Amino acid sequence: LGSKEAQAMVPNVKAKIKEYADRGDRIIFTRDTHGENYLETPEGKKLPVKHCVKGTDGWQIVPGLEIENCEYIDKPTFGWLNWDGFAEDDKIELIGVCTDICVVSNAIILKAKYPETVISVDADCCAGVTPEKHKAALETMKSCQIDVFEGKM
């Protein structure tokens, strides 16, 4: 589900990950992970674009973004329900694609699970399926008390 906006944000993401790593922050990559039968699944029937098939180029993290000691979550759907191991006083920032699918889903799940935790999204490090859907997802997250910002917070 790549887009020109997704490609354009990669330098911002790379800089953000370096900033996290330099501070010693916990870095978790999530990978939308599907099988060869994706188009036969309920999700695949509603979003009939074969993507993120485990082991393929579209599934792997963009070259140059991975760092030592990062963690991976291979999630079979938009949102991951097993966000465990965070303290209420942690700050959790999300970046990535697609703003209007995976990012918004996980931001809202995290806010529901950790209501006293600051959950934020850097809009400059996200991209949606379209620019319009990206903006709509950012507004939805703001409505759900997710701190949405651009660049430095």
Summary of predicted features, one role per range:
Residues E93-L94, I109-A112, G128-V129:
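Metal-ion/cofactor- or nucleotide/acyl-coenzyme-handling active-site neighborhoods
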Residues I101, C126-T130:
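Short gly/pro/ser/thr-enriched loop/turn and capping motifs at secondary-structure boundaries
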Residues G24, E88-I92, E116:
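A general structural motif
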Residues L1-Y72, V118-S120, V129-M153:
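Active-site acidic carboxylates
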Residues H51, G55-I101:
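Internal catalytic-core helix/loop-beta-alpha segment
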Residues F78, D124-A127:
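Short, acidic/turn-prone active-site loops that include or flank metal/cofactor-
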Residues D32, V97-T99, D124:
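Cofactor-binding loop segments of dinucleotide-utilizing enzymes, especially the Rossmann-like FAD-
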Residues A15-E19, C102-Y114:
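Histidine-anchored nucleotide/phosphate-binding helix
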